[in-house]
Amino acid sequence: MDLEGWKEKTALCCRLLQMESLIEASGHISARVPGTDQVIIHPMQASRATIGPRDMLVVDLEGKLLEGEVAPPSETHIHVSIYRHRPDVLSV
């Protein structure tokens, strides 16, 4: 699956978690793109109920923005730290 496919899957997860009331009012969802040093993360400004793949941000394992139109959320460092230290983890 390519990056766009992973962005769609991650956005779908955001919508499903919101629809099923399985996520708190704040917080971010992220996913590691398998075989890469890229992480897809939900931006603070986007609604989890309506988010689509174009809304998702892509950062590297240092938290540097690679793709997207807004700054990564302040919690990005927590997500990427988990991915750096736990290669087996694919989502947070």
Give the role of each language-model region:
Residues 1-4:
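Basic/polar N-terminal segments that are highly enriched at the extreme N-terminus
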Residues 7-92:
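An anion-binding catalytic pocket shared by soluble metabolic enzymes
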